[in-house]
C-alpha cells in the first residue's frame, strides 16, 4: 500500500479513472435520455435499445483505448473487483478506483440533471426493475450480464495469451453493448455499480438499488472463478496473492507468463 501511495503514477491512474468514468456516464446516460426528446415518429423500442447499447459499448471502447495505458481503464467497480480477486491489482488501488468511479458517476449525472432539467419524469437513467420483473429475476440478469463482461475483460487482457491480434478495448466495448441488449428491458442494465449509484444519488431514489451492487459483484466474482480456476487456471500460492493485494506488484505475480514484457493487457504503469 505504502509503495503505491507515494507514486505519482498511481494517483494519475486514480484521476484517469475519475475523468474517464465521468465521460462514460455522461455520454452513455445522455444518449439514453436523448430519445425522450421528440425527434420524429419513426422511433421504436428496438431502435432505442440498440442506440443506447451502442452508446454504452462504444464509449467504453473509446475510453479504454484512451486511458487504458494509464489506469487500466476499469470504469466499473465490478471490473475492479474482478481484477482484485484475480490478484492483478492491490486492495488499496481497488478501493481508490471504486471511489473515483463513483464520484465520477455522480458528477456526470449531476451535470446531466442540469442539462436535461426540462424533461418531464426524468429519472436520469436510474436503474430499476421493469414491470413484472421481481428482484430475483433482476438479480439474475445483472449477474449474467456482468459475468460475461468481466469474463471478456479477463480473457482479452490475459498476459499469457499469444493468440490475440485484435483490439481488447473494442472487444470489451462490444461486451458492454451485448450486456445492454440483454438487460435493458429487465433492469435498465446496470452491470456497473458506479453508473447505477450516480443516478440513484442525484434522484434520491434507491429503490431496488442493492440489486445493482450485489448482482454485478457476484457476476464479477463468478467470472474470476470460472476463468482463473476452470478455463485458464494459474499456478500461484497464497504468498503471491498477498504480495499483489498489499504491494500491487502485478509484474511479479503471473508465474505462468513466458515473457512478462510481451503482455497484451491494458495495465497501468
From Swiss-Prot:
As annotated in the record, motif NPA 1 runs over 76-78
Under what name is this protein listed?
Aquaporin-1
A Pfam match is MIP
Give the record's GO biological process terms.
ammonium transmembrane transport; camera-type eye morphogenesis; carbon dioxide transmembrane transport; carbon dioxide transport; cell volume homeostasis; cellular homeostasis; cellular hyperosmotic response; cellular response to cAMP
List residues in topological domain: Cytoplasmic. 2-11, 66-68, 83-90, 154-163, 225-269
Primary role: Forms a water channel that facilitates the transport of water across cell membranes, playing a crucial role in water homeostasis in various tissues. Could also be permeable to small solutes including hydrogen peroxide, glycerol and gases such as amonnia (NH3), nitric oxide (NO) and carbon dioxide (CO2). Recruited to the ankyrin-1 complex, a multiprotein complex of the erythrocyte membrane, it could be part of a CO2 metabolon, linking facilitated diffusion of CO2 across the membrane, anion exchange of Cl(-)/HCO3(-) and interconversion of dissolved CO2 and carbonic acid in the cytosol.
Q: Which domain of life is it from?
A: Eukaryota
Which PROSITE patterns did the record assign?
A: MIP
Q: Which SUPFAM superfamilies match?
A: Aquaporin-like (SSF81338)
Q: Which residues lie on this side of the membrane: Extracellular?
A: 30-46, 110-133, 182-186, 200-206
List the residues marked with site Hg(2+)-sensitive residue. 189
* Gene source species: Homo sapiens
* Record entry for activity regulation: The water channel activity is inhibited by P-choloromercuribenzene sulphonate and diethylpyrocarbonate(DPPC). The glycerol channel activity is inhibited by P-choloromercuribenzene sulphonate, diethylpyrocarbonate(DPPC), phloretin and Cu(2+). Inhibited by mercury.
UniProt note on tissues of expression: Detected in erythrocytes (at protein level). Expressed in a number of tissues including erythrocytes, renal tubules, retinal pigment epithelium, heart, lung, skeletal muscle, kidney and pancreas. Weakly expressed in brain, placenta and liver.
A GO cellular component annotated for this chain's UniProt record is: plasma membrane
Q: Which residues are tagged as glycosylated in the record?
A: 42, 205
Q: Where in the cell is it found?
A: Cell membrane
Residue ranges of the motif NPA 2: 192-194
Topology relative to the membrane: Multi-pass membrane protein
List the NCBIfam families hit by this protein, alphabetically: MIP (TIGR00861)
Q: What residues bear Phosphotyrosine in this entry?
A: 253
